[in-house]
From Swiss-Prot:
CDD domains: Rad51. GO terms for biological process: cellular response to camptothecin; cellular response to hydroxyurea; cellular response to ionizing radiation; chromosome organization involved in meiotic cell cycle; DNA damage response; DNA recombinase assembly; DNA repair; DNA strand invasion. Coiled coil: none annotated. It is found in: Nucleus; Cytoplasm; Chromosome. One of its GO terms (cellular component) is site of double-strand break. InterPro entries: AAA+_ATPase, DNA_recomb/repair_Rad51, DNA_recomb/repair_Rad51_C, DNA_recomb/repair_RecA-like, DNA_repair_Rad51/TF_NusA_a-hlx, P-loop_NTPase, RecA_ATP-bd, RecA_monomer-monomer_interface. This is DNA repair protein RAD51 homolog 1. Plays an important role in homologous strand exchange, a key step in DNA repair through homologous recombination (HR). Binds to single-stranded DNA in an ATP-dependent manner to form nucleoprotein filaments which are essential for the homology search and strand exchange. Catalyzes the recognition of homology and strand exchange between homologous DNA partners to form a joint molecule between a processed DNA break and the repair template. Recruited to resolve stalled replication forks during replication stress. Also involved in interstrand cross-link repair. SMART domains: AAA. GO terms for molecular function: ATP binding; ATP hydrolysis activity; ATP-dependent activity, acting on DNA; ATP-dependent DNA damage sensor activity; chromatin binding; DNA polymerase binding; DNA strand exchange activity; double-stranded DNA binding. Belongs to the RecA family. RAD51 subfamily. Residues 48-77 form the HhH domain. It comes from Gallus gallus (Chicken).
Length: 339
């Protein structure tokens, strides 16, 4: 029998659990902040106390009706509710040990990533077409709904698709493999198609509001950079493109920090055409430059192997050694290579 997967809204959790989740913005009213000002913050896209506490003062001043004195008071009250000072490495280590990892569907790939895709940070998948980026995203959208003891994140998935490659049929095939109810799995995936870079950013404001209402474990953006290649062209617009991209990635990082979701973005590659390319073993590099390199916590390079096998290499990570693993793309999602 297919297992049912349903998640309760995070807002009506017990007081004990609430200390771990983000604080709803309404908490500021209890701290003496005017209800109208709280409403203005919410309309501007701030749905949690954390999002306000982490925001620079000039961002709050851009909100109509928020004066400098009000901004100072709001930030002071938010800082009291959100710990933002120094902590010992021991405490931080303890918090890190509680981080959930979401299985990729392949034992070899999970071993390479020391458990799976990490929540609370950005993982970037880049590679040529047909290397398994989108297939891995589809598999993760289902595995994140599994119970924690089965390698899941016990939460919903959010999928922002900029290339029109999302296929619900793939999710149903993966759900069947894990014995989950297909209709529940589809209900737990919030899907949006991104049409341009401004719309792509706007969707993150909606994502923030939805995450404040319900428990999400994963946010996928496939692909994070495709629309930037078409909306901005030529060297003349490079600076504007990188600034817009940096702002988008900063918002993703905030969502990962605030809600503890795993953020997975896919990226395309570009062929190097400079002199150094002649001596490089693989003359392809991910697009987005240093901006995306610094924003991603873990960068995974996917390339084709023989037949349906693919190879994943850790390109950059603060804690994982540089290594490779083989995986396969099967009818029921990402799995282990038969070889």
């Amino acid at each position: 029998m297919a297992m049912q997967v349903q998640f309760e809204a995070s807002t009506d959790t017990s007081a004990e659990e609430e200390s771990f989740g983000p604080e709803p913005i309404s908490r500021l009213e209890q701290c003496g902040i005017n209800a109208n000002d709280v409403k203005k913050l919410e309309e501007a896209g701030y749905h949690t106390v954390e999002s306000v506490a982490h925001a620079p003062k000039k961002e709050l001043l851009n909100i109509k009706g928020i004066s400098e004195a009000k901004a100072d008071k709001i930030l002071a009250e938010a800082a009291k509710l959100v710990p933002m000072g120094f902590t010992t490495a021991t405490e931080f280590h303890q918090r890190r040990s509680e981080i959930i990892q979401i299985t990729t569907g392949s034992k070899e790939l999970d071993k390479l990533l020391q458990g799976g895709i990490e929540t609370g940070s950005i993982t970037e998948l880049f590679g040529e077409f047909r290397t398994g980026k989108t297939q891995l995203c589809h598999t993760l959208a289902v595995t994140c709904q599994l119970p924690i003891d089965r390698g899941g994140g016990e939460g919903k998935a959010m999928y922002i698709d900029t290339e029109g490659t999302f296929r619900p049929e793939r999710l149903l095939a993966v759900a069947e493999r894990y014995g989950l109810s297909g209709s529940d799995v589809l209900d737990n995936v919030a899907y949006a198609r991104g049409f341009n870079t401004d719309h792509q950013t706007q969707l993150l404001y909606q994502a923030s509001a939805m995450m404040a209402e319900s428990r999400y474990a994963l946010l996928i953006v496939d692909s994070a950079t495709a629309l930037y290649r078409t909306d901005y062209s030529g060297r003349g617009e490079l600076s504007a493109r990188q600034m817009h991209l940096a702002r988008f990635l900063r918002m993703l990082l905030r969502l990962a920090d605030e809600f503890g979701v795993a953020v997975v973005i896919t990226n395309q590659v570009v062929a190097q055409v400079d002199g150094a390319a002649m001596f490089a073993a693989d003359p392809k590099k991910p697009i987005g430059g240093n901006i995306i390199a610094h924003a991603s916590t873990t960068r995974l390079y996917l390339r084709k192997g023989r037949g349906e096998t693919r190879i994943c290499k850790i390109y950059d990570s603060p804690c994982l050694p540089e290594a490779e693993a083989m995986f396969a793309i099967n009818a029921d999602g990402v799995g282990d290579a038969k070889e």
